Amino acid sequence: MKVRASVKSICKDCKVIRRNGSVRVICKNPRHKQRQG
C-alpha cells in the first residue's frame, strides 16, 4: 500500500474508487495499491 498525495492508475487494471471519503486505487497487482493521505 503506497500512501501518496496524488493517486494515479498505473496500469489498465487499476481502478480509482472513493471509500469512506478517501481515494484509493485497487488493482490485481498488489504493488499498485494506493491511497491518498
From Swiss-Prot:
Which GO biological-process labels does this protein carry? translation
**Keyword Ribonucleoprotein among UniProt keywords:** yes
Q: Name one GO molecular function term.
A: structural constituent of ribosome
Example of a GO cellular component annotation carried by this entry: cytoplasm
Name the keywords, alphabetized: Ribonucleoprotein, Ribosomal protein
Top-rank taxon of the source lineage equals Bacteria
Is the Ribosomal protein keyword given for this protein?
yes
Which family is this protein grouped under?
Belongs to the bacterial ribosomal protein bL36 family.
| HAMAP family for this protein | Ribosomal_bL36
Q: What is this protein called?
A: Large ribosomal subunit protein bL36
From which organism does this entry originate? Magnetococcus marinus (strain ATCC BAA-1437 / JCM 17883 / MC-1)
